[in-house]
């Protein structure tokens, strides 16, 4: 209000009854509250102080309903402008009109008289900050630069009041959770924090801390059929051998047979002989120390321009790079293998030469160094290799040909090809395609890759060599490049990168916290968010470790930090926004009511979003991968704890912040004003030039902040709602196609790229890293690696009986393998079993997948026909007449043998084979410690070659499975529990990742639907949210496929959490839509976007920054985590904002459609909970079409203005009138009938399709924002409009506030009705002249049930002539700009404020005043522009104990936004007592 305005009011004007809704109230006396100066003091002696005024509560309860009063009454009394301590009123001698006297002295200088009354006893202090209703008092020298720009339309001085109220202390029992939070915030916050801290401490101190030494542990499947069989087969091999529970031979027979002892010793003697022969071969050349092997460090070379490495230049380059890059460092000499050379009596130790192509060619040509090679020698060596390569590729040339050149396969190999150098070059040093079967005939074969084996074993000691000489250095020389390497330090280097790159996750977390701080302008809330996340994670670790008894803690569990920070970001933004919205009420409600309102809506949103996210995180529990299951349990528990804790720390933090911010601002404000409040205007600038720079910088920041705020308001209050609603057809089609395309890409073609290696060699660094290139590309290019992995080798099929396939270890601990379980029902000695096992041999050999043995292959590799071998062995044994055939297994025994004879003969045959060295290496029988047969293992080769192709391996597995199940069903009783296993570990991992990842995603979507249905009880909204979440998840997975991500355990873990990360944003819109104060779909959609658009976009933008920040990380875990968070949050934001809202535009629930109602709670829910489906029907006379909630009971209450409801805005108002005491006329009720009734319930008319050409659209740019924050204005009006409880309470316990007193561009005589002119008491000219300087506008709180289209106006009889006062244009505009913060944004909340048809033309200005009819548009409909700045009421209340004696019949004028446009006359006949 301008300082020059004059306050005019009746002498006997009444203050509103400040009774609360909790019970009856007593009209309390007005408190003497000292005025607080709004201007800086001139000196220290004139500093304004705020003195608390103690108000003693009545300690004695009375039976009278008017015996008690609350802090709510006190705060409302303090908030009224006329109740303040002010100078005495001047009384006009002519008309008796009173006006407050104006003083030139700041009110703050009058406080000294009251300072002595400040109480020193413990008291409760309530603060009320509301716009000042008093004229601003400023000194002549003002420090305007400290307050920023004072725009008349935006700036309103704020007056701080402090009231001290004594309460009953500990004897007062809180009635609700919000009351506990408001009265004891510090106690509640500290108590909950201590509980969580105690749990965290217990989790840390109980047992060992997590071990991250093996970051890749736990990414293998556990619990599947194949994994259980592979684990059992592994344990069977581990438990077989000397000194172990099982043995391949009966130990009783081996102890008696000396041949067995000699044979047992023959194997190590054979190895020693081979080692001596290899040493003798190397000693002839006197060059290499040993043979190359996979235990040595390896470097892969390739030509830069794809040229062949088989050239003298390339060979020189490889030798040179080895010398400069590897051997030049002093650390290499300490780690390399050393060979001793004797020079006379001296011994010289030097590093062994590397196994490189150049050195082998030097050996073949009998030269000392690779630098001495010539082109001719290189060509001759190529010819030798070309000649010997076919023998290598057909399997004839093997490593043993050097030792046994005349036996077995080596007999056909030429002598000059039996050199170890030929085999080692082809086997180790060159790629598989060099001189292969397809390229051996090429004239100039191409050598693409070549390996160099360093004489250093793989170990962590090579870490320094890599970091000092290889990482970050140029690895190219003469167009030859080192592109891959395997130094055995991949795991250690990964942990090194994790530690070095940890700065990126820290920066990402800080980005989320800074986003919270900047958005909410509170570092305290950001710090509390971090504390809440830490306590939630540590408490979840306590439950993870103590309650769930899980010992394995994978490294990726730490990624839950970003998930919880994002959850805290969403919770804090929505909660604090709504809290600030409650504070923007004029005046704000008491803290208890505000907190109760915020917890009802935002607490509900937090619970719905948090519970849904937590349960979807738990969906990863159904996965078979251990790390994914552990991550699901930990993240789900942490999210649940964080959700529950958010309902404690968020409200407590806001109460504490509000409580202590007032004290700090008052203390700091006085000190901050001293340097600049000098008598000399230039004193501020003369103090220091640094202050001018700081002031300029601060002004720039303010300007930037205001510009950003205006842009945000324009985007999220206008552009985004209009864009979503008007282009909903495009959005729903576009995102539907995006979801369908993502589903097709991720599930059908091409699908996620499955891993080509087991989990131990998973990708840890970027694809361009030399370690990753070796594992992904070069490992499959060399024959020694391919043979080690069994690639392109026939797969072995193993059939096992006697052992139960079980995994009785802890499935949540990869190190817990369990024990071996023996089948007690195993019996292979029965007659039926012997016959079935004999027939099984022929059945296997007749299968298409069986690979028969060649004549050159060792029969020990295949024991499928061991029964036939036993029959043959028994038949060739000759027994004498004195010998017992059954005891010595002679030829006189017919088959099938008696069970005891079968076991004895079988044991003897195995002992004889073992003595001869023909015992199968892996198959055969397993004997227990007593010599009995405990298990049977049958192994044979198949025609299927080992492959990484999932489809090929799946076809082979299904073929074997169907055949084996068919055969085992016909087996005798003792053999029916057999099972098979093969090299299916990679296939099992691929199968789990390809199927279970999609199953987890689908299950999480189903859980989303279930949880939303349980929390919202609305089927359509739950379905739409589930569709949006599913589309977001599959679109994200489709984008990951397009980014060529390989589906490993890490990726599966991320995808399992995708639904939980996507549901937050959709839940925000869903709850906001269901609580919107609109009955039509489009209005609810616009409301939810305006309310939640900014927090959702801010959260998505914060995660976008997180992804960008983590991109430079070398560790692939951080990079993928950042990319995944970026994609899933941005895609979820798009689907929530555009797809979900578009679905609601088309099929959003209304009129209770889809809502599950329980009969026992229907009545209560309709009274206390905001209904998401209005009962409004198109074409009915219902003001709810304009965006207001129903105020009464029931979900289908209609608020109309016809005689049926007796002309009341709310149903409860009728009952309220009935309770009024009889006396005088009822106050007149006036309203704008054409805007409130008979409007179509459509968002189209209120947004973009208004038929009124001159009226601006609700979402158009013609609307001018008023107030400090348009977004707060909009939110305040919309929140107040949707509170049915507050509306009901206001009508029951509050008095009607005063009517709006304003000016009109019409003349005085045009505003009064002739028949009422004689009844009015006219003010004198002096009073009228004083009133032209300004007007007193009552600033009262908007009722929560009122909206801009439901304006109820009452008028007292003694202020009638004030309506006839006219003002100048500039005075009129200042009034409109300085009114309460209920700005024209309230119109945006209305669904339908435009007119549906055009009335008659504008009447001429010369017509008499009789033609202007009250309650009608008076022919100005096409130019009507309303600027409803304040919802106004009459302060006089019949319930206050005094009855008004007269009522004015003059209609109320609602001013137009432009002075040249006509005002609107509105009038509605009030109902008397009888009529009500």
Curated annotation (Swiss-Prot):
Transmembrane segments: 185-205, 506-526, 528-548, 550-570, 602-622, 635-655, 729-749, 1000-1020, 1023-1043, 1047-1067, 1098-1118, 1121-1141
GO biological process, one term: miRNA-mediated post-transcriptional gene silencing
Coarse class of the protein's main subcellular location: membrane
InterPro entries: Dispatched_Hh_regulator, SSD
Keywords for the protein's UniProt record, in alphabetical order: Glycoprotein, Membrane, Transmembrane, Transmembrane helix
Sequence ranges of Polar residues compositional bias: 60-83
Disordered, as annotated region: 1-84, 1447-1476
GO CC list: membrane
Keyword Glycoprotein belongs to the record: yes
Recorded topology in the membrane: Multi-pass membrane protein
Domain SSD: 495-656
Domain of life where this protein originates: Eukaryota
Classification via Gene3D superfamilies: Multidrug efflux transporter AcrB transmembrane domain
Glycosylation sites: 58, 366, 478-479, 817, 827, 846, 1245, 1339, 1391
PANTHER family: PROTEIN DISPATCHED HOMOLOG 2 (PTHR45951:SF2), PROTEIN DISPATCHED-RELATED (PTHR45951)
Similarity comment text for this entry: Belongs to the dispatched family.
Name of the protein this chain belongs to: Protein dispatched homolog 2
Organism, scientific name: Danio rerio (Zebrafish)
Lineage: Eukaryota, Metazoa, Chordata, Craniata, Vertebrata
Gene, per the UniProt record: disp2
């Amino acid at each position: 209000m301008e300082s020059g305005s004059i306050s005019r009011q009746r002498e006997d004007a009444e203050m509103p009854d400040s009774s609360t809704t909790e019970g009856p109230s007593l009209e309390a006396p007005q408190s003497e509250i000292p005025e607080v100066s709004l201007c800086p003091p001139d000196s220290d002696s004139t500093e304004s102080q705020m003195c608390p005024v103690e108000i003693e509560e009545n300690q004695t309860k009375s039976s009278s309903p008017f015996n008690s009063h609350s802090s709510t009454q006190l705060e409302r009394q303090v908030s009224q402008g006329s109740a303040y301590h002010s100078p005495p009123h001047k009384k006009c001698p002519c008309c008796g009109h009173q006006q407050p006297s104006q003083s030139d002295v700041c009110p703050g200088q009058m406080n000294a008289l009251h300072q002595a009354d400040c109480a020193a006893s413990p008291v409760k202090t309530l603060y009320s900050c509301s716009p000042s209703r008093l004229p601003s008092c400023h000194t002549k020298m003002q420090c305007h630069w400290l307050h920023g720009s004072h725009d008349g339309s935006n700036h309103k001085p704020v007056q701080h009041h402090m009231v001290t109220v004594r309460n009953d202390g500990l004897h007062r029992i809180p009635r609700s959770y919000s009351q506990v939070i408001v009265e004891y915030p510090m106690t509640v916050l500290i108590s909950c924090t201590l509980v969580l801290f105690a749990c965290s401490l217990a989790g840390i101190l109980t047992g060992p801390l997590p071990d991250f030494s093996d970051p890749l542990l736990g990414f293998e499947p556990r619990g599947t059929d194949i994994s259980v069989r592979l684990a059992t087969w592994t344990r069977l091999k581990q438990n077989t051998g000397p000194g172990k529970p099982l043995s391949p031979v009966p130990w009783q027979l081996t102890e008696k047979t000396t041949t067995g002892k000699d044979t047992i010793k023959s194997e190590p003697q054979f190895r020693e002989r081979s080692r001596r022969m290899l040493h003798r071969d190397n000693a002839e050349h006197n060059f290499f120390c040993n043979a190359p092997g996979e235990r040595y460090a390896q470097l892969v070379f390739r030509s830069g321009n794809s040229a062949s490495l088989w050239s003298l230049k390339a060979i020189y380059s490889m030798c040179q790079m080895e010398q400069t890059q590897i051997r030049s460092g002093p650390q290499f000499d300490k780690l390399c293998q050393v060979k001793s050379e004797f020079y006379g009596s001296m011994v010289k130790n030097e590093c062994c030469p590397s196994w490189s192509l150049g050195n082998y060619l030097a050996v073949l040509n009998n030269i000392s160094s690779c630098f001495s090679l010539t082109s001719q020698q290189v060509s001759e060596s190529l010819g030798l290799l070309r000649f010997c390569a076919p023998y290598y590729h057909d399997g004839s040339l093997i490593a043993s040909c050097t030792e046994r050149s005349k036996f077995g396969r080596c007999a056909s190999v030429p002598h000059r090809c039996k050199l170890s150098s030929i085999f080692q070059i082809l086997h180790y040093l060159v790629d598989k395609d060099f001189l292969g079967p397809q390229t051996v005939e090429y004239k100039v074969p191409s050598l693409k890759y070549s390996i160099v084996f360093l004489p250093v074993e793989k170990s962590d000691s090579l870490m320094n060599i890599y970091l000092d000489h290889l990482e970050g250095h140029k690895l190219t020389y003469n167009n030859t490049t080192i592109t891959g390497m395997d130094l055995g330090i991949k795991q250690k280097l990964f942990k090194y990168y994790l530690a070095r790159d940890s700065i990126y996750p820290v920066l990402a977390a800080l980005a989320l916290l800074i986003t919270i701080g900047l958005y909410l302008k509170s570092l305290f809330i950001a710090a509390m968010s971090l504390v809440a996340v830490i306590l939630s994670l540590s408490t979840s670790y306590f439950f993870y470790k103590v309650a769930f008894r899980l010992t394995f803690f994978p490294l990726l569990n730490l990624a839950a930090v970003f998930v919880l920070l994002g959850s805290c970001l969403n919770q804090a933004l929505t909660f604090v926004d709504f809290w600030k919205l409650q504070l923007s009420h004029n005046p704000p409600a008491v803290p208890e009511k505000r907190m109760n309102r915020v917890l009802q809506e935002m607490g509900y949103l937090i619970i719905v979003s948090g519970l849904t996210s937590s349960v979807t995180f738990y969906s990863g529990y159904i996965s078979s991968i251990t790390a994914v299951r552990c991550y699901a349990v930990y993240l789900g528990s942490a999210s649940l704890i964080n959700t529950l804790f958010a309902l404690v720390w968020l409200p407590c933090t806001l109460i504490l912040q509000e409580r202590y911010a007032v004290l700090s601002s008052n203390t700091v404000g006085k000190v901050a004003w001293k340097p600049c409040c000098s008598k000399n205007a230039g004193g501020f600038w003369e103090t220091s030039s640094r202050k001018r720079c700081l002031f300029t910088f601060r002004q720039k920041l303010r300007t930037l902040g205001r510009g950003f705020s205006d842009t945000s308001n324009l985007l999220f209050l206008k552009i985004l709602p209009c864009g979503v609603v008007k282009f909903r057809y495009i959005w729903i089609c576009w995102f539907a196609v995006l979801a369908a395309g993502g589903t097709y890409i991720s599930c059908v073609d091409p699908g996620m790229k499955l891993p080509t290696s087991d989990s131990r060699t998973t990708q840890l660094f970027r694809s361009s890293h030399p370690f990753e290139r070796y594992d992904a590309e070069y490992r499959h290019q060399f024959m020694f690696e391919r043979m080690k992995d069994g690639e392109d080798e026939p797969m072995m099929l193993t059939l096992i009986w006697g052992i139960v396939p079980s995994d009785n270890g802890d499935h949540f601990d990869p190190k817990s393998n369990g024990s071996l379980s023996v089948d007690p029902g195993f019996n292979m000695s029965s007659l039926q079993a012997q016959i079935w096992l004999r027939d099984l041999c022929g059945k296997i050999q007749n299968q298409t997948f069986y690979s028969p043995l060649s004549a050159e292959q060792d029969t020990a590799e295949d024991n499928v026909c061991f029964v036939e071998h036993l029959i043959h062995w028994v038949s060739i044994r000759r027994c004498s007449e004195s010998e017992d055939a059954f005891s010595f297994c002679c030829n006189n025994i017919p088959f099938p043998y008696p069970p005891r004879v079968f076991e004895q003969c079988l044991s003897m045959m195995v002992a004889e084979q073992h003595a001869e060295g023909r015992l199968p290496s892996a198959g055969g029988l397993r004997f227990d410690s007593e010599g009995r047969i405990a298990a049977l293992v049958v192994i044979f080769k198949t025609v299927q070659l080992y492959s990484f192709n999932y489809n090929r391996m799946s076809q082979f597995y299904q073929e074997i499975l169907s055949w084996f199940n068919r055969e085992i069903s016909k087996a005798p009783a003792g053999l029916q529990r057999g099972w098979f296993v093969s090299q299916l570990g990679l296939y099992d991992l691929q199968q789990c990742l390809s199927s279970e990842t999609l199953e987890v995603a689908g299950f999480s979507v189903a859980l989303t639907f279930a949880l939303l249905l349980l929390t919202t009880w609305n089927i359509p909204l739950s379905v739409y949210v589930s569709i949006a979440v599913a589309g977001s998840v599959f679109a994200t997975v489709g984008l990951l496929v397009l980014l060529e991500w390989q589906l490993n355990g890490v990726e599966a873990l991320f995808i399992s959490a995708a639904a939980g990360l996507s549901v937050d944003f959709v839940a925000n819109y869903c709850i906001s839509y269901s609580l919107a104060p609109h009955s039509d779909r489009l209005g609810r959609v616009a409301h939810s976007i305006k309310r939640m658009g900014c927090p959702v976009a801010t959260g998505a933008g914060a995660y976008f920054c997180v992804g960008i920040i983590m991109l430079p990380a070398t560790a692939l875990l951080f990079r993928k985590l950042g990319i995944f968070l970026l994609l899933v949050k941005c895609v979820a934001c798009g689907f929530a904002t555009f797809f979900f809202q578009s679905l609601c535009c088309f099929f959003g629930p209304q009129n209770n459609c889809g809502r599950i109602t329980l009969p026992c709670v229907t009545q209560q829910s309709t009274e206390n909970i905001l209904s998401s489906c209005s009962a409004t029907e198109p074409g009915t006379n219902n003001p709810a079409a304009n965006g207001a909630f129903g105020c009464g009971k029931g979900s289908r209450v209609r608020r109309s203005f016809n005689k049926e409801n007796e002309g009341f805005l709310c149903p409860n108002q009728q009952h309220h009138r009935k309770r009024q005491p009889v006396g005088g006329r009822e106050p007149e009720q006036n309203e704008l009938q054409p805007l409130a009734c008979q409007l179509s319930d459509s968002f189209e008319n209120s947004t973009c399709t208004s038929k009124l050409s001159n009226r601006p659209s609700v979402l158009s740019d013609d609307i001018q924002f008023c107030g400090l924050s348009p977004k707060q204005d909009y939110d305040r009006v919309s929140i107040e409009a949707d509170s049915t409880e507050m509306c009901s309470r206001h009508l029951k316990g509050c008095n009607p506030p005063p009517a709006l007193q304003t000016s009109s561009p019409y003349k005085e005589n045009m505003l009064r009705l002739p028949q009422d002119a004689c009844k009015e008491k006219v003010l004198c000219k002096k009073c009228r002249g004083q009133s032209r300087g300004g007007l007193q506008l009552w600033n009262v709180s908007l009722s929560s049930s009122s909206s801009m289209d439901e304006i109820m106006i009452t008028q007292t009889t003694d202020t009638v002539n004030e309506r006839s006062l006219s003002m100048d244009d500039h005075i009129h505009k200042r009034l409109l700009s300085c009114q309460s913060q209920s700005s024209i944004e309230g119109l945006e909340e209305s669904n339908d404020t435009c007119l549906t048809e055009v009335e008659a033309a504008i009447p001429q200005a010369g017509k008499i005043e009789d033609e202007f009819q009250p309650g009608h548009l008076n022919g100005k409909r096409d130019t009507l522009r309303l600027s409803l700045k304040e919802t106004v009421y009459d302060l006089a209340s019949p319930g206050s104990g005094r009855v008004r004696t007269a009522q004015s019949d003059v209609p109320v004028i609602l001013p137009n936004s432009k002075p040249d446009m006509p005002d609107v006359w509105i009038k509605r006949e009030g109902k008397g007592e009888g009529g009500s």
